[in-house]
């Protein structure tokens, strides 16, 4: 009789859960874990196509959403993930704009646009969206366009955006999120296996990244019934005991 028991070699390495926990705490990925979207080589090399195609796809919605905000003279605005600066022309010149992005190549393009347009009210700098190097309540308005589904930790990024926004300030997001329609959601989940290698996610749930933030929802809508994009405009609550978004709806 052949035994069904297979003995493991004494030299076989066993997985140590303590090691896994330490690796997770220090950001060490296992061999099977895919790199974060923004670290994708394809993502870094797609800048020419980004500048050619992306304006046709998204610029109109971004510009309209910025121009829908009441922006007072002297207000401080932070754009997280400014990229090559395709959104910068939509901001009024009477405000002070700071743009941050991880890609220094994209920021070089943004600086070219700033110099060519002689914009003295705009400054861009390299920075991680998940670790914004600004004090709490530094800005009156914080914006981000099609970035939250690109970063490693979307919830962390949104938390940082809320932190640097002053109480009573506004947060504006344009992004695609997982559809509430089950059929479309399944398609997006399948597509995510491919899009992650191109630098973005299609399975990100809106509630997962904003429901615990101290924000009051002002507007949440799609530009058209068939649009893949969602536009969110919210106000930072000042009272730490105030209801969260999920409770304020």
PLM segments and residue spans:
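A short SAM/SAH-binding and catalytic strip from SAM-dependent methyltransferases
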Residues: 141-153
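A short acidic, Gly/Pro-enriched loop at the edge of an enzyme's catalytic core
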Residues: 130-141
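C-terminal alpha-helical "lid/dimerization" subdomain adjacent to the S-adenosyl-L-methionine
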Residues: 34-37, 49, 54-56, 172-230
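Conserved class I S-adenosyl-L-methionine
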Residues: 7, 13-72, 86-87, 109, ...
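Helix-to-beta-strand junctions that scaffold the AdoMet/dcAdoMet cofactor pocket
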Residues: 72, 151-152, 165-166
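Class I SAM-dependent methyltransferase SAM/SAH-binding core
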Residues: 78, 82-131
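Glycine-centered, small-residue-biased loops immediately flanking beta-strands
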Residues: 75, 169
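A short glycine-rich, Lys/Arg-flanked "PGG" loop and its adjoining helix->strand segment in the class I
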Residues: 155-167
